[in-house]
Amino acid sequence: MLARKSIIPEEYVLARIAAENLRKPRIRDRLPKARFIAKSGACNLAHKNIREQGRFLQDIFTTLVDLKWRHTLVIFTMSFLCSWLLFAIMWWLVAFAHGDIYAYMEKGITEKSGLESAVCVTNVRSFTSAFLFSIEVQVTIGFGGRMMTEECPLAITVLILQNIVGLIINAVMLGCIFMKTAQAHRRAETLIFSRHAVIAVRNGKLCFMFRVGDLRKSMIISASVRIQVVKKTTTPEGEVVPIHQQDIPVDNPIESNNIFLVAPLIICHVIDKRSPLYDISATDLVNQDLEVIVILEGVVETTGITTQARTSYIAEEIQWGHRFVSIVTEEEGVYSVDYSKFGNTVRVAAPRCSARELDEKPSILIQTLQKSELSHQNSLRKRNSMRRNNSMRRSNSIRRNNSSLMVPKVQFMTPEGNQCPSES
């Protein structure tokens, strides 16, 4: 009754609210697509249920290099501490077995007591002094008040063994630290790719293009680019292949993937019959579950180490009907690169159909170019007309201002009745 008499506002009536909610379509948030290669080049792959963990210990050096820095530093510190403690126990046992500790406890601790010539290691009277002597032996920082004598052949054996173990630990751990700092992927941090790839017409063909550049002046020798398309496919027998990799060629006059990366380059792939993008149109691209992986390989000029940079483009990162802007200009005899426009694109005329349809009906490209030319001419006409209108408005406003600033002529009457104009 309250609703009928409009005492309750209509926006609070439950029946109306329920009807409006039913009319509104429920749009669920689309889950982000899992990509095989991240934009940074890291492999987005998780290894689970590995049973034979011992295989990693068979190649211990590679395992140490592949660890994270915090784990490597912990192992680096613990290896030295454990070796020092182990040999400190051995030195203390040598002194304990020879009776050096009891001798110092009975006769006192004096340098002139004559005990130094009768003990294995001088001034090793506790575990703390044995630990300090172990550090002095392995790190070779120089002997102070503690030194070894000729009294115990066992002490000489322990000394030789600790020196060998210390050299092995130094070689392995320092080599591991060096390899981690000089890894090839560090050089790949200055190899950059455009955030988006584009599909546009080049030389009458639909082409898939992206831009790659090098921020350093030192070059990448024998640089090559490989492109792969990864997508989920189903065989005629019904087998589902979750990661189907297919190489696609790079447009190069010498029919090779090698490039000369002295300046940012636009890598082009012609979408032809061999391309997996041959049957994909602009509308189909949005719903495609594919990933284009780009791999750049080469040799670092300064170190001679082979490096590799990777990135990928999913369907949402491919812009149809765009082209990269030019960023290389010549200034005073030197080529200049503006990296602020590295990933900038502009919209260009491109057919929305697939490359197959374009090959079957070449007139589609001609019609698209004609339409773009007409639209370009119309935009130029509108722009020129706007400029003319603006210029006319400016001229009219200037005339009005000038007319308002004009001084009116004043006439004076002479006694004889003649008019005499005043000079302004």
Swiss-Prot record:
Per the record, ranges on the Extracellular side are: 95-126, 146-154
- Composition skew (Low complexity), residue ranges: 387-404
Q: Which Pfam families match?
A: IRK, IRK_C
Q: Which residues lie on this side of the membrane: Cytoplasmic?
A: 1-69, 177-424
Give positions of region: Disordered.
Answer: 374-424
Q: Which reaction does it catalyse?
A: K(+)(in) = K(+)(out)
InterPro entries, per database record: Ig_E-set, IRK_C, K_chnl_inward-rec_Kir, K_chnl_inward-rec_Kir6.1, K_chnl_inward-rec_Kir_cyto, Kir_TM
According to the UniProt entry, its GO molecular function terms are:
ATP binding; ATP-activated inward rectifier potassium channel activity; ATPase-coupled monoatomic cation transmembrane transporter activity; sulfonylurea receptor binding; voltage-gated monoatomic ion channel activity involved in regulation of presynaptic membrane potential; voltage-gated potassium channel activity involved in ventricular cardiac muscle cell action potential repolarization
A single Gene Ontology CC annotation of this entry is: presynaptic active zone membrane
Motif interval(s): Selectivity filter: 140-145
Q: What is this protein called?
A: ATP-sensitive inward rectifier potassium channel 8
Source species: Rattus norvegicus
Q: Which gene encodes it?
A: Kcnj8
